[in-house]
Regions:
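Short, Lys/Arg-enriched N-terminal segments with co-localized hydrophobic residues
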Residues: 1-4
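Hydrophobic helical h-region of N-terminal Sec-dependent signal peptides
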Residues: 14-27
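Sec-dependent signal peptide cleavage junction
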Residues: 24-42
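Surface-exposed loop/turn elements that mediate protein-protein interactions on large endomembrane-trafficking
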Residues: 39-54, 80-101, 136-154, 188-205, ...
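Beta-strand-rich domains and repeat architectures in extracellular enzymes and scaffolds
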Residues: 48-78, 116
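Repeated scaffold domains used in trafficking and secretory/extracellular systems
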Residues: 57-64, 108-119, 158-171, 209-224, ...
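Residue position within the beta-strands of beta-propeller blades
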Residues: 72-73, 126-128, 176-178, 229-230, ...
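Short glycine/acidic-enriched loop and turn motifs that connect beta-strands
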Residues: 76-79, 130-135, 181-185, 234, ...
């Protein structure tokens, strides 16, 4: 028992050292942007459409469509790529710092690309056993020269419920983000900063903390310049950029409006809707179903009986992540594959081997 306690203490110290190395300096990316919202961010991006729909059954890789370009990242390796659909070129843009690409790192699908030629996304780093720390933050990558900058990094204990929360939005050349911090009794913060991570400002701490602690099973969405707190029932609060709190009625209508505006797709559990079609990934092996909402006609467009599959619906394209087991237990091959919206393969973008025993 003494040996176990000693090892746990060592592990927590290592996590704290890692957090210091990473630097706690503050930001976070949220869901993808629509054309109208992107235009309000930068005049240079008026002609760009950013689409990044709901991920179906996976959280370990990220992708976003910007016009004819697909920006995507791979879990564990830390690489960020750009695939040009028209030119059929696949370019490696950057590799994340060593500290944030260990075997326990994964990246959220909530990301932005081509805002002043920058790619923003959030990553998580789990450190330690069940009582270890969970670190999270926003990484910004210059898509022209591949330079990487950590805009925000925070660590909280993952041993208490609910798990630490971290959400963000980019609106009118500002990043608005909300996060939790603590080890046993979380405090919640709603803050803002510039796109380069400067001028960080806490908008609300007391009001947001009170709401999140009082609303059972609370969750947060950051939409434009406000944070929304909700649960699965009928409690829905909004705190704006001035820190003013209001309670919102008609939860379903408001919630759906926010989700559509921040993702470009209607999100409903493990489903995504885009241009009159509903996509649903079913089963542990990833069976991708496409349904015509108007006619009710549905069809399985991608599936496998021998490997695990998950999908990111990007609109005209779908990014497929295939996880195929090897002969040796714990080893597998990961392949990121681009599909058209009918589920047919366009190209294998990137593949790599993973050993879960390490």
């Amino acid at each position: 028992e003494r040996w176990m306690k000693k090892n746990k203490m060592k592990e927590r110290i290592m996590c704290l050292v890692l957090a210091v190395m990473l630097g706690i300096s503050g930001i976070i990316p949220t869901a993808p942007v629509l054309k109208t919202e992107a235009a309000s961010l930068s005049a240079a991006d008026d002609s760009q459409t950013v689409i990044g729909c709901h991920r179906l059954h996976d959280t370990s890789y990220a992708a976003v469509q910007v016009g004819n370009k697909i920006y995507y990242s791979s879990d564990r390796t830390g690489y960020i790529f750009c695939y040009d659909v028209k030119k059929k070129t696949n370019k490696k843009l950057a590799k994340l710092p060593k500290q944030v690409r260990n075997k326990n790192t994964y990246y959220s699908y909530k990301n932005y690309a081509n805002i002043s030629n920058m790619f923003y996304y959030k990553g998580y780093l789990y450190c330690g056993l069940m009582d270890g720390l969970m670190c999270y933050g926003i990484i910004r990558v210059n898509v022209k020269n591949g330079k990487v900058k950590k805009l925000f990094f925070e660590c909280s204990s993952s041993s208490v419920l609910p798990e630490p929360s971290f959400e963000f939005s980019i609106y009118k050349n500002k990043i608005y983000y909300a996060y939790s911090n603590g080890t046993s009794n979380y405090n919640y913060y709603f803050a803002s900063m510039n796109l380069d991570g400067s001028h960080k400002k806490v908008i609300s701490q007391k009001a947001l903390t009170k709401v999140c602690r009082n609303v059972k099973d609370s969750r947060m969405i950051v939409y434009r310049d406000a944070v929304y707190v909700y649960n699965n029932f009928d409690v829905f609060y909004k705190i704006n950029k001035k820190g003013k709190k209001t309670k919102i009625k008609n939860l379903p209508k408001t919630y759906m409006k926010v989700k559509v505006s921040t993702s470009g797709c209607v999100i409903d559990g493990e489903k995504a809707q885009y241009k009159g079609y509903e996509y649903d990934s079913m089963g542990s092996f990833g069976l991708l179903n496409k349904k015509n909402i108007a006619t009710g006609e549905e069809k399985v467009i991608n599936s496998s009986s021998s490997e695990r599959r998950s999908y990111i619906v990007l609109g005209d394209y779908i990014l497929l992540r295939k996880n195929k087991a090897k002969k040796k237990l714990g080893e597998c091959k990961i392949t990121l594959q681009l599909l058209n919206n009918k589920g047919k393969k366009i190209k294998d973008l990137y593949s790599y081997n993973v050993n879960y025993n390490e």
